Every structure is written in structure tokens, then in C-alpha cells.
Amino acid sequence: MLDVNNFEYMKIGLASPDKIRSWSHGEVKKPETINYRTLKPERDGLFCERIFGPMKDWECSCGKYKRVRYKGVVCDRCGVEVTKSKVRRERMGHIELAAPVSHIWYFKGIPSRMGLVMDMSPRALEEIIYFASYVVTEPGDTPLEKKQLLSEKEYRVYREKYGKNFHAGMGAEAIKKILSDIDLEKETQELKAELQTAQGQRRTRAIRRLEVMEAFRNSGNEPSWMILDVLPVIPPEIRPMVQLEGGRFATSDLNDLYRRVINRNNRLKRLLDLGAPNIIVQNEKRMLQEAVDALIDNGRRGRPVTGPGNRPLKSLSHMLKGKQGRFRQNLLGKRVDYSGRSVIVVGPNLKMYQCGLPKEMALELFKPFIMKELVSRGLAHNIKSAKRKIERMAAEVWDVLEEVIREHPVLLNRAPTLHRLGIQAFEPTLVEGRAIRLHPLVCTAYNADFDGDQMAVHVPLSAEAQAEARLLMLAAQNILNPKDGKPVVTPSQDMVLGNYYLTLERENAVGEGLVFKDINEAMIAYTNGYVHLHSRIGVYAGSIQNERFTEEQRKQLLITTVGKLVFNTILPESFPYINEPTKYNLEIETPTKYFVDTTTDVKTHIANQPLIDPFKKGILGNIIAEVFKKFHITETSKMLDRMKDLGFKISTKAGITVGIADILTLQEKPEILEKAHDKVEKITKQFRRGLITGDERYERVIGVWNAAKDEIQNKLILSLERLNPIFMMQDSGARGNISNFTQLAGMRGLMADPSGRIVELPITSNFREGLTVLEYFISTHGARKGLTDTALKTADSGYLTRRLVDVAQDVIIREDDCGTDRGLTIKAIREGTEIIEPLEERLEGRYARKTIRHPETNEIIVKENDLITEDIAVQIIGAGIEEVSIRSAFTCNTKHGVCKKCYGKNLATGTEVEVGEAVGIIAAQSIGEPGTQLTMRTFHTGGVAGDDITQGLPRIQEIFEARNPKGQATITEVAGEVVSIEEGRDRGLEITIQGVDDRRSYTVPYTARLRVEVGSMLDRGEALTEGSIDPKALIRVRDVLSVQEYLLAEVQK
């Protein structure tokens, strides 16, 4: 038997007929399977015990030999060897075919290997194999060519003319004859000679043929083995047959396919023995060929063979390929022991690195550990009694369990695992009930909520696995997102709302302008109702535990609110006191304008100061990032827990609720609608007079309604109170956005119909007033589309991720420095005038390609091949430098991967990337993970031609597949100045560009939106109109690097 676990390497090759016979333990001659009365396998059939081994351990078929003592005896009555029944999983049989058949993989695969070796087209091969044409195998001294195809009629004519002077045949036999005659050495030499001269199509074909020839030579396989004389039969346990209740049998499809082969093969043998007419024999040979094809790969050629209920049968190939095949389903997707799953609920009192594990689950998962501990403590005499104790759930078991799980991390995983933060490690704490408790802050990383989500638990067993889980995978270690280095553990929902409410300021609140000696005094006053949480007050700066205040400031009063005093207690002491949501306050110090002399009249001072914005979600994220930068992981995770607790506590105390009275309708709404109706009336009149086209009318009507909706939205925002609960929820970033609010209180606006075209009848009502029946009906289109899109999008996005991982998985950091002298010049990414990604964000964490000097003082900002930190990036921007040459993975010289310097820093840890880091997979996940959130909709600006610019997920796929994009932009092939834009001779606008040595004109449709005007200076390959550039066109006009840069910029959008 094979030793499955111990091998050096694995090689897959063609099997020769002798090899197949050597695997086999006997020939299968009959199509019978199991006798339905005795339930014993039929002799010489597909389940024969003599060939494949006994059905029962140590027992022959007829029952003459039973027991282990007869091991290895071959029964003289039934011929079955006495051995374990497990051999039925590994013993193979074979079928001796009455005529050779072609293996469909080699004849039908792409490219057809058989066709390449014989230098024939797959079409011709098919005609020969399926007995439609003859092929000349030996031309003799006739004018025929070898491998020439002859029809039935031509064959008869030539037979009469030349008699026995030439040989021609059909079917796999003829092909086998030709394949046997091929001299690989000679063919290889001829092909190499041909490569010297050949061009174009002939050259590519020669290269492909040479590859196959070389492969045959090097592997020692014979081309004629692509034709089968013997068919292997796989072991019966792999294609089982079981009896169901009611006496019926369930069987694997393979048995049906094998039976068809055996039946046809036996019939062919009989016909050959009888000496039947050629036409009948040929037909039978063709049927045998088709039966073998169906067995190996059903449905590859012609209609698949179907079983009961018109279901295509699963052939050998189907068993292996695809998601449900052997590899992806069973070898890569095994079920694992020491795992469990349950519903998750929130655990607000957990620490960042903890999770709550239900007691019963922990007992089952840690069973072996508990049993060992029980025995070693002497609480149980042996493993068996320890097991009994656990099953009875004795009292001492729980104490041992507490001991065992201490410092033993478990892994929590939520499907779908879209990026590496979908599996993290936690220290378990035991909880009552049957639900897993999850820390609220890690929900963002898992994309989890508590509406019934389930999660799986896995126990790392070995010491190494535990160490790895603790050091690399602990939730407290994974604060930054690997895709952009920003914190992924940000407070959400209630936590955001609590901290927002805490840091609000109100005018003329109770106790405004009071002065306190320290935070304790202020808190006593607050508790007793002398001062409000939002009141602006003065506090002696010296009493605040903050190392950032200067000596001067410590003697002054700090103007702040009670809430901000509380908020600042969660931050580390050496962090600036945060009084306003600005970058300056976060990174450098509290602005001096908040300090006043102790002699100041605080009340009047405050009354003249504007209110400061409260801290919204974004600022909380920035605070976390800043704390992480200065204090690293441990301190950050403690601070996060404090922020979470404070947020929950305050949002509970604030008692923010939503009632119908909080939705205030707009007084001016009727007149805005009135105006819009008038405008639409005017546009329709213009259309009736023929002044504008139908398309233009539609566009303008939609424009009018969008403008009306925006006006209502803007007026709504202005009319809202700062303390309106719905406004606070939206403003803080806890939940909802302004358009939800507009739909509640303003108007719902325009809706799209199922095809995605916008219906020009707007929904003028809002949810507060209620919709009319027609409006409700129009709304249902959009809702339905939303649901179907989500379902389709998830599958698409997952498939995109899978393809990305497939191409990027070999990209690993291989060395420290590849020593390249090339780099990539980068500048801020812009879309029109708007900056999508500023230069400093692109620079931070990369290595400089050239030494960068200050343009005025000429001092060195950063040396070449040094890391550009955030501070250096700010200096570069401050010096007014707009483009910088950096080391980039595009220009890295490392073979099979990238080097440290070209990659830059590891965003997930904020430190230098280490050799061996699988950066390709991180990149693939970072693109694939947000794919689920991208929209599927192709936005239509009213369905005008040339304006369907694809966005979202389809656009990303378009870029990676390098397809011809939808809504393609016209690009210029010359560099120069745009001299004129005028109406062309035929439809459209003509743009003329004067280059250095020539002049070119491009015609674009009228509806295209132009990106250039007369006098614009253009580079080669720049777009003249809005839209996506075809990368293949760009590479013709410019170099590879510019295409890489264009694709990079597009993906970043």
C-alpha cells in the first residue's frame, strides 16, 4: 500500500496501457453490479470481490474462510483473498477495449494537445475519431499526402484507382497509427529550424507545437498513449452503491457510465467475432468512443448523458473540478475538529482582547485538556473516569476548565472571510447561556452585527499555534486595517453618539461661565444640577493632569465644557487636551485661544465666543490613529475600551430617542414644488414646438427635479435644530445620512425603473406625510432592484477576489533591496479639479527614489532610498514640491516578488515590512473586500450614448481584465496644442491638434463631454473626452509604465 504521508514530490503523467494493467487486480467483464436478492456482488462485475477485495473484513465471498488467522489466503472455491475490506478503496480494475479510443482531454482540451502533436486541426481530428472521414496513414507510391482527409466517396474512388497501394483508416486506430509513427527528435529539430524563419501566426503555432514536443521528450511519455487500449476502473468504494429503505439502490453516476462502456465494449467484441458488416462495426466503435468520452468528461462533446429526471451524470472530471470538486471541496475545504459555532451577542463589558465563550461549548472544545488536568491533579484515576466526570458535569470540572482556558486563545471567524481581519484571536471568558459574546469594537472588522449572525470558534492546539495566535492574531494587535493603515477598530453607532453628545456645546446652558478649581468640583456641580454637561465653563489648567500645558498655561483658566473634561480623562496623560476637533489640536497642542487670565470676566468672554463643533466619528478615528502613532498597541487598546465604555454610558444617560415629532416638515416645500412644476411645463412646451429633442426634454426635466430636491434638502438642514435627535444621529456619523433625512422630512425625489432608467415622475411626498398609491408603486421598483443587486454583487465580488488572489499569491517580499535605479513619479490623484488622493497620503511609508531637496534653501529633506515618514511627507508638501520620484513595486527588479524598499512600510503594523510577508494576498484582499460595498449599478445620465460610464464593481473588473471599456474615451496620438474645435463634415465635433511635426484631427460625437478646450497643451495618450481609456490603445501610443500609472489611478478611484 502507498505511504500517503511520506513523499518527496508528485508528478502527473500519461499512463501507458502496461501501467494501467499493472495497477489492475483483474478485468471487469460484465456490467452487473450487485445481485438484488443476495445483495452479493456479481462475479466479474463492477463490484466483483475477486478483483477488488472482500466486502467484509477477513471473510471470503462464499464464507469458507472467516477470521484474521486466514489473512492472505486466496479461497479455492470463490477466488477471493481474505483481507481487510478497506482494500476496496484502493484496488483498481481494468477493461480491455475491443477497439482503441481517444482520450477526450487530449483531443478536446484547449489547446488540443493531440492536434498540436499531429499538426492537424481539432475539427479534422473530430471527423476522424467519430468516423466521419478517412485519414491517409500510409500514402505508399500514390499522389496522396500523409494525414490527408478523405470523405467516404473519395475513399471508395481512390480504393478502386490505387487498390492496396495506400492505407487509410478512421477512428482512434488510425490516429494511434499516425502518433506511433511520429519521431519526436526529428520533429523537434524541424520546428526549431522553422522558428528561425517563420512569422506571425505560423510562428506562434510552431512555438506551441514545440512546447508540447519538448514536454513529451522530457517526460518520457509516448504520444500514442493519448489513445486508450485499456480503460482503468476506479475502486468500488469510491463509486459506492448503497441500499435505501424500500429495497431500492442509490448509486454513484460513475457506475452507470462504466456500465454503458462495458455493454458497448462487449457488443463490439461479439460483432467482431461474428464478422459483422463494416458499417455496423464502425457505428459500434463510435458508440464505444462516445461512452468512454462520457465517462471521462460528460458533456464536453455533444449532449451530456442524462440519468433519471434529465440530470446530466457526473463524470470523472466533474468529480475533480470546480467548487464542488475533490480539490476545493474536500482537500482545501475540510471540516476541522476542535471547532464550534453559535449565534453572537454583544459583550460590552469585555476587554479588547476577550470574547465570551458559552460554558457548554468550552467544555466540549477543551475536553482533552480538561481530562489531562483532572488526571494530573489526581481528581480522576484515569482518562476514562475523567471523561465520565466531564459527561456528568461534576462541580470540580468547572474549576479545572477555568484553569485550562486561562491564557489559551481561541480563534473567532465570521463567514464570509473577505480579508485577514475576518479571523482574529481572543482570550475566552466563560459565560452563561449558549451565545458567543463579541466585543463591540471588532464588529467593523468582521462586518458583524447582532441580528442573528453566527460565528465559528477554533482552538489552536500546539504551543506554536497558541503563540502565533497570541502574538499576531490577538484582536488588540489588529487595530490598523492592512489596506490603508487607518484604524479599523473605530467606535460606531451608540459609542459615536455618546461621545458626540458628551462634547456638544450649548449657548446659555445652566451654569455657563462658572469657574471651577478642578474636574472633581465641576463633576460635583454637574451631579447636583448646578451646571449642565454642555455648559461652557472655566477650569484651572494647573489642575488638569496633562503634560502638554506650558508653565504659562498652567497658571491660566482653560475654557471648556464639563463633557470635554470627562472626555479627556480617557486619553493618555501626555496627549494634548482636546478642546476642538482639529488636526492642530490633536497633533500639536491645545490652541492658546482657549486659555484666559484668572482675572478675566469668564461669563462675558464665553458669551462672545462661537460654539465649537462636537467630536464626530471621523475625529474619533483620527484620535485613535494619533494615539496609536505615539503610544502603540497596548495603550491604544486600553484607550479604545475607555472610549467605548464612555460612549455607551453617555448615550444611555442622554436618552436620545426618535419620535414622530422630531421630523419637522418644511414650510417652503409647496412653493418650491410649484416652481419646479412651472419649469417642467415650460420645457414640455418647448418640446411640443420642436425646439428641443425628446432626449433633451427628458434630461432637463430630471435636472429640474434634482435641483428642487437639493433645494429642499439644503433648506431642511438650515432649519434643523442642533439638538434634534435625528440630526444628532446623522451629524455624528452614528447612523443614517442626510438623504435619509430628506426622504423623511423633505421629498423622496426621483426613482429608477427596473431597467435603471430614471422615471421622470418624482415622488414629491415624504415618509412623514405618507406616499400616494402611485408613488408607493414607483418606489417598489427601486427597492426590488436594491435587493437583487446586493445578492448578485456578493457573488461577483467574491469571484473577483478569488481571481485576484490567484494571480497575486506569489508576490512575496523576497529581499531587502533589489538595487534598482528606476522609480515611479507620483503626484496627487485628481479627477477634474477635485483631489481624490493627496500627495502626502501617497508618499507616506514609501522610499524616496532620489534625494529630495527643498527648492529654495536646497537643504536635503530626505536622502535617496530612505523612508518617507509622515513628518517628512508634510515637509515635502510644505516645500511646495508637487511630484516626487519614489521606489515602486512596478519598477522592482526582484525575481518572483518585490523587495522591502520598493514595497514600503507594512500598513497593518505601521512598521517596516518583513521579508516573507505575503503582500500579494494582502493587496488582493484589500481590493476584493470593499468590492462587496461597491455598487453594481451602471449610472445612466439619462441613457445618452457615449455617457454610460461604468462604475463600481463592473469597472474594477473591466480594469483588471483589460477589456475594451464601456463609454470609451478618445485619446490623442500626438503631443501638442489643441488648435481648433469645430463642427465636423459628418456628424460630430472635430478636434484638431497641432503636434511638433504633424497635425491630427479626431471626430467625437456631439453628446460627448469634452475634457479639452482650444489652447490646451496635451501629452500623447491624453483623453480628449470624458470616459475610460482603453489600456491597449494607450500602450500603443505610450510606454508600459504610463499604462501601469493609468490603471493605478483608475483603481484608486
Swiss-Prot record:
| Cofactor(s) the protein needs | Mg(2+); Zn(2+)
Residues binding Mg(2+)? D449, D451, D453
List ligand-binding residues for Zn(2+) 1: C60, C62, C75, C78
Pfam families under this entry? RNA_pol_Rpb1_1, RNA_pol_Rpb1_2, RNA_pol_Rpb1_3, RNA_pol_Rpb1_4, RNA_pol_Rpb1_5
Disulfide bonding pattern of the chain: none
A single GO CC term for this protein reads: DNA-directed RNA polymerase complex
Amino acids binding Zn(2+) 2: C818, C892, C899, C902
Write out the catalysed reaction: RNA(n) + a ribonucleoside 5'-triphosphate = RNA(n+1) + diphosphate
Record bears the keyword Lyase: no
Family, as annotated = Belongs to the RNA polymerase beta' chain family.
Q: How does it assemble?
A: The RNAP catalytic core consists of 2 alpha, 1 beta, 1 beta' and 1 omega subunit. When a sigma factor is associated with the core the holoenzyme is formed, which can initiate transcription.
Q: Per its record, how is this protein called by name?
A: DNA-directed RNA polymerase subunit beta'
Protein species of origin: Listeria grayi
- This protein's gene is called rpoC
